Structures are given as structure tokens and as C-alpha cells.
Amino acid sequence: MYDVIMIGGGLHGGFAAWHLLRREPGLKIALIEQDSSYSHAASARSSAGVRVLFSQEENLRMSQYGHEVYGNFGDLMALDGQPQPLTFWRQGYMFMANTPEQAEDMATNHVLQTGMGAEVNLLDASALKKLLPSFRADDVLLACHSPKDGWLDPYGALTSLRRKNQALGAEYIDGVVTEFEQSSGKVTGVVLQDGQTLKTEWVVNATGAWGGEISKMMGFEIPVVPLPRTQFYFECREEVEPFGLTIDGRGCSVRPEGKGYITGRTHFERAG
């Protein structure tokens, strides 16, 4: 019998378990992960951006807290007194506006962001050209730049978090959830593909883009669907000035990766 079962052993499920175990040591927690190597996991394959460039206060506060955690990650994940360092590239984050509507929203968001203490700068086309002379930005009306944001090593974060949770008593289980046992509208058990049933008091849906599918298995729907994202790695023949994770008004992103860069776009028109 478990106190809590996390469906998903990536960063979302892992951090949920870590917070619970810090608050209440001794909880019996299991994390069910269908890809324990994380070779196909969204957490490991993401661009791993960490930013304060949000339009909702709740998201911004969570991101500010995330900065605290990742900024002290090594000490927070220490095992036997030994820090578990995490690489965090604080090279900045930028959104570009290509339409008047995007520029207006960006200016409105800037008021919220700076009002909550975030370091965010608005750049017009001239200032943007000075900062990124290698970028073609003649169709950019406005940009917002957060110099203290960036990206981290997602696989390093995953493995360190997993080891820390296991040291705190959490159990990671390889498996695929196929259904839930329920009684009086409450989930009481999680059934896995191999046939075993795990009894629990609470279930946390931490499956990210697949959260909608898991919720349907519980008997209700949430507006969460997976979106395909295409990413490519490339290198430049000529040297480019240092820059952070950058996203234009069409949703195309680019950031440094090793000796080159990764670029990609989410296909919103292919939801599901």
C-alpha cells in the first residue's frame, strides 16, 4: 500500500515526490515510469529552458521558485554530504514579436514581469540589432530579453533527482499504466500492463503531454493533448556572437548546443 503514486517519473513526477518527502519524510511513494532509460522521455529531450518570460503571475512565481531550486540544485540533491552539480547555462532567453498584436502583448507582459521583480528588457529593432548583429531581424517589431534565464542539462537533472528520491525512500517502478481501480469516485489502485495492481491513497498525474490520456482512464477529461515538435542540430561556418535561447514570433526557436545549435518548432496545427 502506497501513500502516493506518481504516474510519470520524469522531472514533474520527480520534483512532486521530492517536495512531499522533504515535507513529510517516511511517506511511501512510488513513481511509475514507462521509459526508465529516459531515452524517449520529454524531460530528457526538451530544450530545457528556464525562463521568467510568462504572461501569468502563477507561472512567473513558479519560474522564480524554479530558479531558486536549480540555482541550489547541487546542494539540494546532495548524497551523503556530496553535492550533485548541475550545469545551468545562464545565457539569456528571448522572445521576438513579428506582429503589432504580439508587440502589444509583450509590452503588457513586461509590466507584469518587472513588477514582480524579474529582470526583463524590452528591445526595439535597433537595440536588437546591436545585441545580435548576426540575426536577420528586419521584421521584428519588439523583443523581450531576460539575461539571467537560460537552459540546463535535463538528463543530469533527471538522474540526480531520481537518485535523491531513492535515497529519501521513493520507489521507481518500470511499467505502463493500463487502468485504475476506483471506489466511490476515488482512485484506490493503479493497474499495470504486467498485471500487477498497486494500492494507493493518492495518485498524481505527472505525465505531461499525456496527462489527458491518463485523466480519461480515471473518468474525466482535461484540455491537455500532445503536440509534435521537430528539432534539428546544425553548425555555422562563421562564428556567431554568444546568445541565449531565442524564439521568434512564428514559434521557431534556436539555442547553442555544444559546437553548434539546435533549432525547432512545435506544430500546433497537429495537436493530438
Describe the residue ranges of each PLM region.
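A short, glycine/Asx- and small/polar-enriched loop/turn
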Residues: 101, 132-140, 181-188, 239
